[in-house]
Amino acid sequence: MQQIKTALLSYGMSGRLFHAPFIHVLESFQFYAVWERSKNGAQEKYRDVKTYRTFEEILADDSIELVIVNTPNYTHYEYAKKSLEAGKHVIVEKPFVTEAKEGEELIALANKKKKILSVYQNRRFDSDYKTVKKIVREEWLGKIVEAEFHFDRYKEEIGIKKHKETPGPGTGALYDLGSHIIDQALQLFGWPDAVFADIRIIRPLSQVDDYFEVLLYYTDMRVRLHSSYLVREALPGYILHGTKGSFIKAKTNVQEEALDKGIVPGEDNWGIEPESEKGLLHTEKHGEVIKKYISSERGAYADYFTEIYKAIRENCKAPVTAEEGLNVIKIINAAFKSSKNKKVITL
């Protein structure tokens, strides 16, 4: 197996939790380098990793095949573009970019360079979403007529990360959390006909949006996507209703919690939700009414990286294509336009 030498462009929370553990533990990857301007956080944890002080050093190292752009949102376009131009394969943290035209340019460049360009939509590989996906795919609810996804939290205080709390391209809840549930909705239900959105600032000291409600219009279905930073008592993460029944599932975070505790990916019980988090299925099949709790699917962020390896080495499709990441940005751009003009935007 020819390992893929991989470089991270940051070792903050994203690099520490969602990338480094996987490219270190998976045999198909080598956590080869990291860009840290002054600290040595990655090297303290992973002794063999090289620490570069400039982005240019990453680009100049010809042994690096894959660059993970996990820097602030407004930098994604610039760093992804320069990485592709340097002949690297690229993974970009969600959100892909801040404007659709940037994504279109990057896709064209990746095609020209014949390089893999993927967006890290890791929430596709969470237990809760995988369980919802199975219920929908197996048609337990009949034809879906209504779906509601929540990504709420309680965070009254303003965060310490200035790039997340200062108004500018790519900041706010819709880019940060909305990119997850928009992607999930598009994967389950496809491209909508129109979008309507209400995007607001609800915390007294916040300068960026911390509340949104996005309504996706389909011919025979509506999908409501909601997030608020002032939800102390969590609502279900997923509520789906169909012609045959309903499914209600709590939002969980078992992989992130395990990673934050330093648990190595792949250990026993990795990605398995506790029994208390089972989703409630109430439906009808073959004339029989069924009401029961459904065990969750196993979450596996590692699957994303396994598929990336196949995309690079075996010319397979990336687990999340740049085009799929671009579609999320198109919805976000349309949602901001809708909220500003207070009208439905046809897509």
Feature annotation, model-predicted:
Residues A33, E65-L66, E146, R222:
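Short, Asp-centered acidic motifs that coordinate Mg2+ and/or phosphate
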Residues K50-T54:
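Short acidic-hydrophobic, aromatic-tinged amphipathic segments that line or gate anion-handling sites
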Residues L66, P72-N73, Y77-R124:
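Beta-strand-loop-alpha-helix segment that lines the small-molecule cofactor/substrate pocket
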Residues R123-L205, K342:
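Predominantly a Rossmann-like dinucleotide-binding segment in NAD(P)-dependent oxidoreductases
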Residues M1-Q3, L66-I68, K115, Y293-S295, ...:
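C-terminal helix-rich "cap/oligomerization" subdomain common to oxidoreductases
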